[in-house]
């Protein structure tokens, strides 16, 4: 089913025919597509299928739909945290229509702001790394902070998938409110590292994560980014080890383990300052036959939602 409203295309993806139906095993994909009805919205999900500016000529525009389908492989119950997502009210906003067009970023940003006006937390599904920009710009960049999990600093010049951080700095984001987690040796140039330091970014390299642990690094990153306002968290899955994220063309051996990524996702969802999250740089057309990267991205959605369910009461 497909319908369109105000530049957003909404898709209700049916459960894959190969999956059995069991009323006692509710699927997370059904939970998301059911919507909130008349209830206040807890979690909104918006697809931003950017791909045209990618240096890798990737098929990232196929990924939002792939993540939605992958959610059908999981249930709504998180046993270790005693959380059932049926207690949260979701809203699948749909996909921004052709976000790579000249007016695409404007329409994506408008869709983000519409969702934020109704939901406690928004997750956008990219798309290449350029999808980070309109998602973060849904917040007031004069006050907002950013936590970026990425194998590199997106500080290249030009309007590309690897220039999101540069674009946000140009739009008014201050480096002192930016935290970066997971940068790897041999993936960051000396020039970019010097700029990140000069701008006052809080940096937690892959080595720091290994030494301190992902939970401690995320706690420090979120605290630094959230010092004066709401926070956007960007999950560029190229931060992961290539063995678990083969659909991320920049992923390297030695990156984050899947469990570390999911711990970070839960921390983002649980932090009261976090208002927006994105998942980017997954090319569903380049995934392994078992769709491990797409399924990992779907688990990021669920872990963020679990964190939201366990946020401290205001």
Which sequence ranges carry the predicted segments?
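Conserved alpha-helical scaffold segments that buttress catalytic/binding sites
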Residues: 3-314
């Amino acid at each position: 089913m497909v319908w369109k409203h105000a530049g957003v295309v909404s898709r209700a993806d049916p459960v894959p025919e190969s999956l059995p139906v069991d009323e006692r095993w509710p699927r997370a994909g059904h939970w998301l597509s059911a919507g909130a009805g008349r209830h206040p919205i807890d979690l909104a999900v918006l697809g931003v299928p950017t791909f045209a500016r990618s240096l890798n000529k990737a098929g990232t525009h196929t990924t939002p739909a792939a993540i939605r389908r992958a959610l059908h492989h999981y249930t709504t119950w998180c046993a270790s945290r005693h959380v059932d997502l049926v207690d949260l009210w979701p809203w699948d906003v749909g996909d921004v229509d052709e976000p790579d067009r000249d007016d695409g970023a404007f329409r994506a940003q408008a869709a983000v702001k519409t969702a934020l006006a109704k939901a406690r937390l928004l997750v956008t599904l990219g798309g290449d790394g350029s999808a980070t920009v309109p998602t973060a710009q849904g917040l007031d960049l004069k006050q907002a902070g950013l936590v970026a999990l990425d194998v590199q600093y997106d500080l290249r010049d030009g309007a590309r998938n690897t220039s999101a951080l540069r674009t946000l700095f140009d739009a008014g984001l201050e480096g002192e409110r930016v935290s970066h987690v997971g940068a790897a040796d041999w993936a960051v140039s000396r020039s970019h590292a010097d700029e990140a330091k000069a701008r006052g970014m809080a940096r937690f390299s892959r080595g720091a994560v290994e030494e301190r642990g992902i939970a401690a690094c995320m706690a420090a990153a979120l605290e630094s980014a959230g010092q004066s306002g709401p926070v956007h968290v960007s999950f560029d899955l190229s931060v992961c080890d290539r063995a678990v994220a083969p659909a991320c063309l920049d992923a390297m051996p030695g990156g984050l383990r899947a469990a570390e990524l999911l711990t970070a996702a839960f921390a983002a969802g649980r932090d009261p300052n976090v208002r927006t999250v994105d998942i980017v740089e997954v090319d569903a057309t380049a995934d392994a036959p078992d769709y491990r990267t797409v399924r990992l991205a779907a688990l990021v959605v669920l872990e963020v939602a679990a964190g939201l369910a366990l946020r401290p009461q205001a």
